[in-house]
């Protein structure tokens, strides 16, 4: 059993307003569960515009610490961009699998958001009525369908997927600096000096950024 987890937050720094999960058992999506959560900070206008969860909707809801035990009980937790959910959630007693990292490994060069992959891979999944993209349970169904597709295509076991998740992977776009939002491959072609400057001057960098810069500097 693999448990797909999704959170909606007050912003990029965290503050959970909703958590949901579904389980994938024998290729089927089962056991849906979701909770609205009282956050530890105000919801940013930008986040509210995306998930449409308001302060009034969560004002009387339980804290995440009171809700999270409902989501224990799996050896494997799965999320799309799992590093984010893992960072904002309390410690979960299991191994993590990231479908975004798996998709990057399996299908290089395509867009990796869960909805982009849903469309590109032509996934067929029945989402919950009354919900929409960027509600936690809705996104769990999309990620679960993606996970099933990844497993059917690759033949990877949970152990292999967790191993891939734990390794650095190439970044596809810059998330900072003057080329924020631009494809790394395009920047490497147009301005390789910028990559060289980053590699030589950043005091600290993530393993993914180091791997990406080294890859493009050695191959362009």
Curated annotation (Swiss-Prot):
Its EC number is 3.1.11.-. InterPro entries: Exonuclease_RNaseT/DNA_pol3 (IPR013520), ExoX-like_C (IPR046768), RNaseH-like_sf (IPR012337), RNaseH_sf (IPR036397). This is Exodeoxyribonuclease 10. One of its GO terms (cellular component) is cytosol. Capable of degrading both single-strand and double-strand DNA with 3' to 5' polarity. Has higher affinity for ssDNA ends than for dsDNA. It comes from the Bacteria. Keywords: DNA damage, DNA repair, Exonuclease, Hydrolase, Magnesium, Nuclease. Its cofactor is Mg(2+). One of its GO terms (biological process) is DNA replication proofreading. Signal peptide: none annotated. GO terms for molecular function: 3'-5' exonuclease activity; nucleic acid binding. It is an enzyme of class 3 (hydrolase). It comes from Escherichia coli (strain K12).
């Amino acid at each position: 059993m693999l448990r797909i987890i999704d959170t909606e937050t007050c912003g990029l720094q965290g503050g959970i307003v909703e958590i949901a999960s579904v389980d994938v058992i024998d290729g089927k999506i089962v056991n849906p569960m979701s909770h609205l959560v009282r956050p530890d900070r105000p919801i940013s206008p930008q986040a509210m515009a995306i998930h449409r969860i308001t302060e009034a909707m969560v004002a009387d809801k339980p804290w995440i610490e009171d809700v999270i035990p409902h989501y224990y009980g799996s050896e494997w937790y799965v999320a799309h961009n799992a590093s984010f959910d893992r960072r904002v959630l309390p410690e979960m007693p299991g191994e993590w699998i990231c479908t975004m990292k798996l998709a990057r490994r399996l299908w290089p060069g395509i867009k990796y958001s869960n909805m982009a992959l849903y469309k590109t891979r032509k996934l067929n999944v029945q989402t919950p009525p009354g919900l929409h993209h960027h509600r936690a349970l809705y996104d769990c169904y999309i990620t679960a369908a993606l996970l099933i597709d990844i497993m059917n295509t690759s033949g990877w076991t949970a152990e292999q997927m967790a191993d891939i998740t734990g390794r650095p992977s190439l970044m596809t776009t810059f998330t900072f600096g003057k080329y924020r939002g631009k494809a790394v491959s395009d920047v490497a072609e147009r301005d390789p000096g910028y990559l060289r400057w980053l590699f030589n001057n950043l005091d600290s960098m993530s393993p993914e950024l180091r791997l990406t810069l080294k890859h493009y500097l050695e191959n362009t």
